[in-house]
Amino acid sequence: MARIALVTGGTRGIGRAISLVLKEAGARVAANYAANDDAANAFKDETAIEVFKFDVGDFDACKDGISKVEADIGPIDILVNNAGITRDNPLHKMDPEHWDAVIATNLSSAFNTSRNVIDGMRERGFGRIINIGSINGQKGQFGQVNYSAAKAGLIGFTKAFALETASKGITVNAVTPGYIATEMVMAVPEEVLNTKILPLIPVGRLGEPKEVGRCVVFLASDEAGFITGSTLSANGGQYMT
């Protein structure tokens, strides 16, 4: 896979795994991050993956950031919209700023990045755009009206955008993970994990971040060229559509 890939939120959690698996598959990867310079530089030193700091929720920042990626590495063939945040609260307690922040980072970001790579993909006649959604965008989650709305919106974005790009050699798909063994999930008390979370998952375990990464690698491959507008659920059978 001699392609150039940009992974947003690509230095931590699921994004880190996606970056690593894409690199293992032969892609040249650029990993975007938002804030933690020390962690990003440590990731770069450990993995030899280039890192690029910009706010995916800001269109102009994306324009400048993607221009730098393409100047430093080359035209982007694969875009993985993975960046995401949570600001949880029931709606009756939710601050407007927390709604806006989650929508900006989890949904508007997909427009901001895609708009800045799509012209080049159309000119070259090839592109792979993979949007990382969530099981909570499919089934909803208490206290996550903002997050669930953003991730559900990402699925609609995927389907509509896929229709617009299908004739140009560009595919647009989504991956919706369930409970994945990231630092955040592994911080849950073991008793809660064993009694409240694992019983919800028919396969009886958490997903591994690299399993999500392998979904992305497949959808980014030449072999997946007949798949577009699809949502690939990676949730151990917790939610089936």
Q: What residue ranges belong to the model's regions?
A:
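Conserved glycine-rich cofactor-binding loop
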Residues: T11-R12
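The beta1-alpha1 cofactor-binding region of Rossmann-like NAD(H)/NADP(H)-dependent oxidoreductases
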Residues: F54-G65, P96, P209-E211
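Substrate-binding pocket helix/loop in short-chain dehydrogenase/reductase
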Residues: P90-L91, D95-I103, V185, I197
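Active-site helix of classical SDR
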Residues: S114, A150, T158
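Alpha-helical segment proximal to the catalytic Tyr-Lys
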Residues: D119, L163-E164, G225
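Residue(s) in the substrate-gating loop at a strand-loop-helix junction
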Residues: S134
